Design a protein with these regions (language model features):
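C-terminal hydrophobic helical "lid"/dimerization subdomain
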Residues: 3, 280-335
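NAD(P)H cofactor-binding loop motif with strongest signal on the N-terminal glycine-rich segment
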Residues: 155-156, 225
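N-terminal Rossmann NAD(P)H-binding glycine-rich loop of SDR-like oxidoreductase domains
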Residues: 157, 161, 165
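Adenosine-nucleotide cofactor-binding segment
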Residues: 169-232, 280, 284
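Glycine-rich phosphate-binding loop and adjacent beta-alpha segment
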Residues: 228-302, 335
Length: 335
């Protein structure tokens, strides 16, 4: 039996600037299970993530570029519709990296069976998925959390940033949160209870602003944006401060990425530690994260918000809106 799969493909590479909807195409093709790919899955939820932007250029990166005209990839949760594999049954909920399409056929090694949980199943793409794991590993392994310190978080209204803020608050940290809209500022202050939140778009001079809101300086900066914000934060880091580099979204979309940090002397003088990390390197470190995060969620100590677009046809728009900061919390496409 064959079925029609609708999917998102990239029409051309985008070396600089923001993607446009005309850079993408919704295509269809017939698929059917066979001896090699013997499981048919219908996706229910598709994760939309900033790292995908790096795969839309031909530059060498930590993941290969998307292939022009072929299915894009991304994390997804789906349900098994047909199976000739003994380990998977019709109705099983599964996780895969075969998102950006409504249906697909695959082999068993491309799927992970999901356990039922007492919360929305898409939590496996949010706080219980890459989002939460990134925040957890970034803080505990690379940020080297110490009690009673002060953390600055950029892109704090997004999925990773908002999780970082809440973990830090749970551990008694002072949390300074930067975001790009007044609505997100309100959410961070009144629902997530950060110590201070501000809309960076309304700040003329970040260096002066940091001195005003945190004169004692930052012990840790969790960087999701890079660029000028990172450079400004370096000035206000404490001696022996730590900077964890999780993303560089401000530079991925820039038409002129700039010449890099101009205040590296402060890294030397302040004896700062700057550490970049990729969550893909930590797939074998999920057990303590899943245990801790599940408890926080059950106790109401981690809250998550979702921005949801309906239908595979709206996946390109959801991605563009993510890069423009129009999401609060996790960006998802519901199929």
């Amino acid at each position: 039996m064959s079925v029609v799969s609708k999917y998102v493909s990239l029409k051309n590479y985008i070396p600089t600037g923001l993607p446009k909807e005309t850079d993408f195409e919704i295509k269809s093709k017939e698929i059917s299970i066979n001896d090699e790919k013997n499981i048919l899955v219908s996706n229910s939820w598709i994760s939309v993530d900033p790292y995908m932007r790096a795969r839309m250029t031909e530059r060498k990166n930590y993941k290969p570029p998307f292939k022009i005209g072929e299915e894009m990839e991304g994390y997804a949760i789906g349900k098994v519709e047909l199976s000739n594999d003994k380990d998977f049954s019709v109705g099983d909920l599964v996780f895969s990296s075969l998102g950006m399409r409504d249906k697909f056929v695959c082999s068993s090694d491309e799927l992970k069976k999901l356990k039922p949980i007492d919360m929305p199943i898409q939590s496996y793409l949010g706080p219980l998925g890459m989002t939460g794991h990134t925040a957890y590993i970034g803080l505990f392994k690379h940020g080297k959390l110490k009690s009673g310190q002060t953390i600055l978080v950029s892109s704090a209204g997004g999925s990773v940033g908002s999780t970082v803020c809440q973990i830090a608050k749970n551990l008694g940290w002072k949390v300074i949160a930067s975001t790009g809209s007044d609505e997100k500022v309100d959410w961070l202050k009144n629902e997530l209870k950060v110590d201070h939140a501000f809309n960076y778009k309304k700040v003329e001079n970040l260096v002066l602003h940091f001195k005003e809101i945190c004169p004692e300086g930052f012990d840790l900066y969790f960087d999701n944006v890079g660029g000028d914000f990172l450079e400004s934060a370096i000035f206000q880091m404490k001696t022996y401060g730590r900077i964890v580099i999780c993303g560089r979204i401000s530079q991925m979309n820039a038409t002129n990425p700039g010449s890099g940090l101009k205040n590296m002397a402060y890294v030397l003088v302040k004896r700062l530690t700057i550490k970049g990390f990729l969550i893909f390197d930590h797939d074998n470190e999920r057990e303590p994260f899943e245990t801790e995060m599940s408890k926080w969620l059950a106790d109401g100590k981690i809250k998550f918000k979702e921005t949801i677009y309906e239908g595979i046809e709206n996946a390109p728009k959801s991605f563009i809106d993510l890069l423009n900061g129009k999401n609060i919390g996790k960006m998802l496409v519901k199929i």
